[in-house]
């Protein structure tokens, strides 16, 4: 029996320079680097696209980020979309662009809660 993956994601932790974060995310954080969870990859197979799998994976990634944040003081989730279509996907769910890095999108964890409700 053969199995195939409909999609996957991967997470890691990191930090963002304060000036790279949008004002709404860096507010009240001083000049210290902002702790983030990086959504390093999120992909859905071509045959499974358009079925809500990407949204489900994003919700799962956010839930896991919330668990990490309880222990590590994470402020936001960060991703680097591979292309404009991916960027549009993330911005639909509240990710906002970095003022200094066009291909870097961030989601404040307070806003992320809305995506998983």
Predicted feature descriptions by range:
Residues 6-7, 99:
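A structural microfeature
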Residues 8-41:
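Conserved acyl-donor/pantetheine-binding loop and adjacent beta-alpha core of acyl/acetyltransferases
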Residues 40-50:
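A short, internal acetyl-CoA/4′-phosphopantetheine-binding micro-motif in the GNAT/acyltransferase core
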Residues 48-50, 95, 100, 113-114:
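Gram-negative outer-membrane beta-barrel domains
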Residues 50-64, 92:
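Conserved acetyl-CoA-binding loop-helix of GNAT-fold acetyltransferases
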Residues 58, 81-86, 102-109:
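Short glycine/proline-centered loop/turn elements that form peptide/ligand docking sites
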């Amino acid at each position: 029996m053969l199995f195939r993956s409909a999609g996957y994601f991967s997470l890691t932790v990191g930090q963002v320079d304060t000036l790279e974060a949008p004002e709404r995310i860096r507010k009240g954080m001083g000049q210290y680097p902002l702790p983030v969870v990086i959504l390093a990859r999120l992909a859905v197979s071509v045959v499974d696209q358009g079925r809500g799998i990407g949204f489900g994976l994003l919700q799962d990634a956010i839930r896991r980020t919330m668990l990490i944040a309880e222990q590590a003081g994470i402020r936001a989730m960060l991703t680097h979309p591979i292309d404009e279509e991916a960027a549009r996907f993330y911005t639909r769910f509240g990710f906002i662009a970095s003022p200094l890095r066009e291909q870097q999108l961030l989601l404040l964890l307070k806003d992320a809660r809305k995506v998983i409700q």
